[in-house]
Amino acid sequence: MNADRSSSFATPTRRPVGGPAPWSRCALPLTLALSALLAGCGGGSGGEPNEPTPPQPPTNGTPGGSIGESQRISAARSTATNNAACTAIAPFYWEVGDRNAARVSGSVNRAGNSTVYTADSFMPLASATKWLFGAYVAELRAGVLTPQDVRHLTFRSGYTSFSFCLPGQTVDGCLAVPASNGAFTTSTDGRFFYDGGHMQKLGSLVGLGNLNNGALATEMRRLLGDDVAISFSQPQLAGGAQATPADYARFLRKLLGGQLRLGALLGTQAVCTNPDTCANALATPVPRTESWSYSLGHWVETDPAVGDGAFSSAGAFGFYPWIDATRSWYGVVARDAAAGSGNESANCGRLIRKAWVTGVSP
């Protein structure tokens, strides 16, 4: 895995969570109805990114347009239970909602498999942790990020040799052992390189270095809210959190509702990530047939052919949270599967999102 971080999201082992490329390869062939938002590449060598203009959130009323809720529910439910991309990943739990509450949800089961996932199923988040940490830093800075924060949260800091954390370590302990975790690489500084080292180093820089799993979870909840009941299996800021879909959905609703400052910053400071189309990109887990952007601890699905501008942060074991480009809706696809399952969850989740937004099952 360490030999080729740019070509696959897969992690070689079930535990520890994370590592340098913590979710599965994301070949997403779906053409979505919404127009692609935000530009792809930008910026010269070593400079700040060209910042795409994020979509504006709705200013009043309840989102929905002319499509009736019953039509949306029917389309989303049909997609989750019948579309081949979704039945292939069963069992899983899914949910779509707005800033106030869930609007539709369900458990899709598999014959012969006794596992049933619900909103209260506790599971590893893997790279979905990144979105939480981005929101934590935004709260810590009262919404005004420093240039150093931005470089670390958009994976351009030069800390690009992360391997794993051990459960009993602190944040700083993980930076020290294995030694590669805290290594700075001059040749990657200022260029996009998908790796957990950026966030681990930033965690130390913002004062989290002495915290172990329990203390880290307490501190994150202090700013994100105790109702976002995350815990940590290892003190890794890019991939060590655990939670239920219900907990993560509360986090997404807070982003939509403006209770967390990152909600207003979604998609900002985004950088190009495809080395084939962007001179400032070195390593990405997204297939090079697609060009996504990376914002402050979350992806922006901006590929001009198949992207819809949604914000997301898929995890290695199949947890896929998203917010749509208009910042009207959120969703989750949640399961605890083998390492490398983020791709399949994203494929299903994008279809459910399209069904909800358009009212038509793909």
Regions found by a protein language model. Give the residues of each.
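N-terminal secretory signal peptides that target proteins for export/translocation
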Residues: 1-23
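C-terminal motif of bacterial Sec signal peptides marking the signal peptidase cleavage site
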Residues: 37-40
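Bacterial signal peptide processing site
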Residues: 42-45
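N-terminal low-complexity, Pro/Thr/Ser-rich intrinsically disordered segments
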Residues: 49-85
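Structured C-terminal helix/loop/strand segments within mature extracytoplasmic catalytic/sensor domains
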Residues: 61-74, 307-362
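A short, well-structured edge-of-sheet supersecondary motif
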Residues: 72-119, 320-324, 328-335
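Active-site-proximal loop and beta-strand segments within enzyme catalytic domains
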Residues: 86-90, 99, 105-106, 111-195, ...
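Penicillin-binding protein/beta-lactamase superfamily catalytic region
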Residues: 192, 207-311, 316
